[in-house]
Amino acid sequence: ERYGTHCEQTYRTNFNRGCAKCIDWVKFNLALCRRYLNMDGLLAIAIDPSYISKSGKKTPHIGTFWSGCASSMKHGLEIMGLALVDVHANSCMMLRAHQTPSTGELKLRNMTLVQHYIAVIKRYKKDLLKVTDIVVADAFFSIRPFVDGIKECGFHLVSRFRDTASLYYV
């Protein structure tokens, strides 16, 4: 379903005219969500990294990333998608796509990939917590550093355990 009357090229051209940095895309897209989703229902923030194939040597943040479709590491780019899910309406709207730095760039920043994902959520936590405190993610994120990191931000994780999970009873 389209939410505008113009083609994609029109939006891209007009939003790239020095104004891309001045738009708070999470707030903008949350305003769209308020219009098209039931904000009183059961909502969750979905996060999912997505691999994008890209060749070239000068593209910023190009590196090797996990491709779920290929079940292997691939050369290209990765974005982390943040979306708002309306559980009862079975619909979802994208809030923000955040580009993942390459492994080399993360090493320069003294960060791991998981720490980067936590930093992305922390960056938008103020706006996200106004809507919901539930984060939904795949099994990659069901590791202690990530769970503890988003818990510090005030979120709760809904995920499945990894195949390597070892459960102990206290």
Each language-model region and where it sits:
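An internal, acidic/charged active-site-proximal segment
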Residues: S102-V170
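Intrinsic-disorder-associated interaction segments
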Residues: G4, K21-C22, V26, L106-L113
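Residue-level detector of functionally special positions within alpha-helical transmembrane segments
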Residues: C7-Q9, D48, D138
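A broad structural signal for alpha-helix termini and local helix breaks/kinks
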Residues: Y3-G4, L37, L128
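Short, basic interhelical loop/turn and adjoining N-cap
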Residues: R2-T13
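Active-site-proximal, Lys/Arg-enriched surface segment
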Residues: N14-L95, P101
